[in-house]
Amino acid sequence: MSPKKAKKRAEGANYNVFSMFEQTQIQEFKEAFTIMDQNRDGFIDKNDLRDTFAALGRVNVKNEEIDEMLKEAPGPINFTVFLQMFGEKLKGADPEETILNAFKVFDPEGKGVLKADYIKEMLTTQAERFSKEEIDQMFAAFPPDVTGNLDYKNLVHIITHGEEKD
């Protein structure tokens, strides 16, 4: 394929990527990308991923794990590639699994519960911040147990199915 055709095909792929999402979703992805692009060079690289994991409390991430993540990208991860990768992952994704995976980032041991105080801190200080009222509503609907833990697996099930697990 000629370089001109390859460029046209890439441009067409970019158009398709942006047409997969609503404008508000693209803006949310842009926020996430900006948070991850720690050195602000327009690309997510190994150091950016390491810093992002550290910010999430995972300081001992193995190089192999980061390398595996980077191998999923067809090249350097700029915003368009980032969006394309998410588009491919989310195509046909189960909403329950998607939300569970978001919680699992904060639960590296896979316990299925998180400290309510930690969730409150994350939801009020990161990305699209929850208001005090929203936090109060969430904990009124899904109160933590007596030890202060929130069963996020049950929470996700209720969010996606409207009822508690049996």
From Swiss-Prot:
Record's subunit section: Myosin is a hexamer of 2 heavy chains and 4 light chains. Interacts with MYOC.
PTM info: N-terminus is methylated by METTL11A/NTM1. Phosphorylated by MYLK3 and MYLK2; promotes cardiac muscle contraction and function. Dephosphorylated by PPP1CB complexed to PPP1R12B. The phosphorylated form in adult is expressed as gradients across the heart from endocardium (low phosphorylation) to epicardium (high phosphorylation); regulates cardiac torsion and workload distribution.
Modification N,N,N-trimethylserine, positions: 2
Modification Deamidated asparagine, positions: 14
Cross-referenced Pfam families: EF-hand_7
Superkingdom of origin organism: Eukaryota
Binding locations of Ca(2+): 37, 39, 41, 48
Function: Contractile protein that plays a role in heart development and function. Following phosphorylation, plays a role in cross-bridge cycling kinetics and cardiac muscle contraction by increasing myosin lever arm stiffness and promoting myosin head diffusion; as a consequence of the increase in maximum contraction force and calcium sensitivity of contraction force.
Start and end residues of each EF-hand domain: 24-59, 94-129, 130-165
Keyword annotations: Calcium, Cytoplasm, Metal-binding, Methylation, Motor protein, Muscle protein, Myosin, Phosphoprotein, Repeat
Residue positions, PTM Phosphoserine: 19
Protein name as catalogued: Myosin regulatory light chain 2, ventricular/cardiac muscle isoform
Note: This chain binds calcium.
One term of GO molecular function: calcium ion binding
One GO cellular component, as annotated: A band
Coiled-coil residue spans: none
UniProt-annotated location(s): Cytoplasm, Myofibril, Sarcomere, A band
Species of provenance: Bos taurus
Sites of Phosphothreonine modification: 52
Any one biological process term the GO annotation gives: positive regulation of the force of heart contraction
